[in-house]
Amino acid sequence: MAKIAVYDINRNQVSERELSDEVFNAEVKEYLIHDMVRYQLAARRQGTSAAKNRSAVAGGGKKPYRQKGTGNARQGTIRAPHFVGGGAAFGPSPRDFSFKLNRKVKKAALRSALSARFKEERVAVLNDFQLEKIGTKAVVEVLNRFELSNVLVVVGEDNRNLELSARNLPHVKVLKAEGVNVYDLMNHRNLVVTEGAVEQLEGALG
């Protein structure tokens, strides 16, 4: 099993722990990560864009003029696409962009993403990340001690002070272990995770 140092928020090493190879040192399968990111982004799409076609536009039920004898080209409705005020030809219609991925694929993709960050040496484990009070400055100071920016922070339990302190920081996001996902792991260069969150991740993915 891989080993990693455990620090407190002052960057003092307090212990060392083993990480599950199955979760943090697995083979990195980039195609799974790619599929999972596509899956997450597709599920976010609204898919509400729409345009009225010739049957949806109001009016146009009556033939504008007789078929022959006027010198004009024959027309059946003034709501055809080539008329001003007519319906759109092949315009967008509401659709659902989401698609399905198997649960095994989702878990394997998350293991690959966690392993990728670990192999890049972009994972820091803290024994805890409790703040005495709400304050953005406190979070900045901790991250500066570790010389980290663009960080995903994963905690094992509700940490309201940390969540409120970090939400005003660009490129810093706080998630509970149960909410960790491939997109956020890939969208942040560094991962800071508490020991409690490590145990939860290993329990869920191991």
From Swiss-Prot:
* Residues covered by region (Disordered): 50-78
InterPro entries documented for this protein: Ribosomal_uL4 (IPR002136), Ribosomal_uL4-like (IPR013005), Ribosomal_uL4_dom_sf (IPR023574)
GO term, biological process aspect, one? translation
Source taxon at top rank: Bacteria
Q: What GO cellular component entries does it have?
A: ribonucleoprotein complex; ribosome
- Indicate the quaternary assembly: Part of the 50S ribosomal subunit.
* Reported function: One of the primary rRNA binding proteins, this protein initially binds near the 5'-end of the 23S rRNA. It is important during the early stages of 50S assembly. It makes multiple contacts with different domains of the 23S rRNA in the assembled 50S subunit and ribosome. Forms part of the polypeptide exit tunnel.
Return the similarity comment. Answer: Belongs to the universal ribosomal protein uL4 family.
Could you identify this protein by its name? Answer: Large ribosomal subunit protein uL4
